[in-house]
Amino acid sequence: MRRHWLLVGACGWVLLILMFVSKFINFSFRIPGDYAGRSEIFVWTLSSVTTKLPSVVWPEKGASQPYILSSVSPSVVEPIDWHLVNEKRLEQLSTVCSNSSIWNLTHTTVRKFVLDRIFVCDKHKILFCQTPKVGNTQWKKVLIVLNGKFSKVEAIPENLVHDHERNGLPRLSSMTDTEIHQRLNSYFKFFIVRDPFERLISAFKDKFVKNPRFEPWYKHDIAPAIVRKYRRSHHDDSESVGLRFEDFVRYLGDKTGRQHLDRQFGDHIIHWLTYAELCAPCDISYNVVGHHETLELDAPYILKSAGIAGLVSYPSIPPGITRYNRTKVERYFSGISQRDIRRLYARYQGDFSLFDYPKPAFLLN
């Protein structure tokens, strides 16, 4: 009898302890949001074991990546299934492509110019469309290895990557119409995009400021031509001052006036053409659209989706190098008139919409 009452008493103490603990255990944490400090709050409680979770948390401007809570430990944040991310991107692409109000900004005839941008790996049935200033050099290295020119990406000389006579990467334009259609209809196709305005900044820095590959025609031919037509004050010596970003913005936003210069510049304009003009995403059915801002997660997904994950690795990506930098964008656009920025946005509006990059209201308003 005594043992019975001791057991009842012990059970009572356990119940009291559980009731007391359940009132105080309520775990909550934040997942980092966009660069402006917005965040999503997720709550997990011991009593109900429920998760307050949107299907995908999309940070503004692609500054980070979508997240879910870990199925193993609710206190751990991990990326969502990247297949769902890609499906969402393709759905967005399809929706915008069918929007007749911006049809002229999103559709391009699949002509030789576009086919020149697409590199072919017949061995593994892959097509890669080149969109400059989004890490294309590394993807070219991956294809060079797959084509058997080198055994690993680290062994490829930098000067060879862009030498299209020697790098072993055939362009789709070099093939017959029958071969082109067969590959477009059956091969794995992908390309990479980036916030349109940040990409323009990267192109400006790479070609007109740093010019690391020593391509003198950008500074000696293209820059002076833009300065002569678009610099509002000619008191400065154009040769010594060089091209300014505001000159570059005026040139890009001049819908009709730039056409003569574009013809004069030839294929060098690929570094600032729209993604629609380069890869015809509304007219070619791509399997994957990668984003520069989430390249750490996109790269392995692309390798896996193309069936080559065990054959080659994407070169390591320095932490944070692909992250969207709003401060840099604001700095470059400071001092540029609202009219010029709006004209620039009007040209790249199709790219912003196709790939779900938010309208840069902080620049336009």
Curated annotation (Swiss-Prot):
GO cellular component: Golgi membrane
An example Gene Ontology biological process: carbohydrate biosynthetic process
GO molecular function: sulfotransferase activity
Residue spans, topological domain Lumenal: 28-356
Superkingdom, natural source: Eukaryota
Main location: Golgi
Pfam families: Sulfotransfer_2 (PF03567)
Binding site for 3'-phosphoadenylyl sulfate: 132-138, 194-202
Glycosylation sites: N99, N104, N325
Annotated coiled-coil segments of the chain: none
Record carries keyword Glycoprotein: yes
Subcellular location as annotated: Golgi apparatus membrane
Keywords attached to this entry: Carbohydrate metabolism, Glycoprotein, Golgi apparatus, Membrane, Signal-anchor, Transferase, Transmembrane, Transmembrane helix
Enzyme class: transferase
Cytoplasmic side: 1-6
Sequence intervals crossing the membrane: 7-27
Function: Catalyzes the transfer of sulfate to position 3 of terminal glucuronic acid of both protein- and lipid-linked oligosaccharides. Participates in biosynthesis of HNK-1 carbohydrate structure, a sulfated glucuronyl-lactosaminyl residue carried by many neural recognition molecules.
Similarity-based family: Belongs to the sulfotransferase 2 family.
Name the UniProt record assigns to this protein: Carbohydrate sulfotransferase 10
Gene: chst10
